[in-house]
UniProtKB/Swiss-Prot annotation:
Tissue: Highly expressed in brain, heart, kidney, stomach, testis and placenta.
InterPro entries to which the protein is assigned, alphabetical: DNA-bd_dom_sf (IPR016177), MBD2/MBD3_p55-bd (IPR032343), MeCpG-bd_2/3_C_dom (IPR025884), Methyl_CpG_DNA-bd (IPR001739)
One Gene Ontology cellular component: nucleoplasm
Gene Ontology MF: a single term: molecular adaptor activity
Chief location bin: nucleus
Name of the molecule in the record: Methyl-CpG-binding domain protein 2
Biased composition (Basic residues): 77-95
Phosphoserine PTM positions: 181, 407
Originating organism: Homo sapiens
Bias kind Gly residues: ranges: 98-121
Amino acid sequence: MRAHPGGGRCCPEQEEGESAAGGSGAGGDSAIEQGGQGSALAPSPVSGVRREGARGGGRGRGRWKQAGRGGGVCGRGRGRGRGRGRGRGRGRGRGRPPSGGSGLGGDGGGCGGGGSGGGGAPRREPVPFPSGSAGPGPRGPRATESGKRMDCPALPPGWKKEEVIRKSGLSAGKSDVYYFSPSGKKFRSKPQLARYLGNTVDLSSFDFRTGKMMPSKLQKNKQRLRNDPLNQNKGKPDLNTTLPIRQTASIFKQPVTKVTNHPSNKVKSDPQRMNEQPRQLFWEKRLQGLSASDVTEQIIKTMELPKGLQGVGPGSNDETLLSAVASALHTSSAPITGQVSAAVEKNPAVWLNTSQPLCKAFIVTDEDIRKQEERVQQVRKKLEEALMADILSRAADTEEMDIEMDSGDEA
């Protein structure tokens, strides 16, 4: 290494045609690496590495890219250039200044003079990016503000929900919702949740953004399935006895031969039964053992049924029969005849008529009607007497109050 007249030190082994900072000359492939506050110039024997200081520089052209932490710039290029400048700095390198040029090298500091060389296309010095910035190239990471993880009651215990608000970009102010499993796995969408949970949790009415079960979504899904013509065709029995048409690729409709062992049998259809909703038979038996009471919590005595009404079937008594007859009177407009078939005593499970109460068949005679009319007249007469007694008692109370008020005024 030899000293430079300007006070700097230059590394040996620098080939001709390579220039240092502040100098000029014809250069080959060169790379510039810019430092923070100072620099040292040290071209390599082959490619010519030059480190440029705060002030001073050269001209050339080439490609550049951002270096590491110091915010410097390095690149490679070919060209000729000239420049004048001064620089101070410290660095390490190997190099040798060209004839007639001057510069800094090694790990010393100093000033460089000027040199001359052939002109060429100017080289732009890229502006270094500040430390910690996103740098050139594709868009940097989006700034977000993390929210607090909260428990999600709609999911199994241990699941957390987090809402993250975007702080930059065109979508600033919007939020993203994430869910975390008890093991810490992150989920970004509802399909991911459904695949992970499987059949353990029904997510058909789950709202991913609010984290709650929405019954309105479930009703919409049911209504959509109900209105779907494909689902309407499922589950309906086909009782049509007409011969079907062969469904083949032929453009002509060909009949199908129907083969049966009982050609005389006919299928009977009951349209009323098809429209009837399923219900529980003899639901009035659930009222067995229950009794009504008045305002004084006294049990009201049940009414007595006529002697002609007798229960039928296992576990039948007067209370159950009374409930069955009352429910039939209020819920059905058909006449009540009881179990007409005599075979119901032998096998009630087969011959029982579910539209009639569990009582034997009975016949209402004229004598029964006359007795019922007499009972109704007696009850009405008792009611009339009770109402008259109440009216008289109210009138007597009013008259006594008037007399007391008159005596008070005279006094």
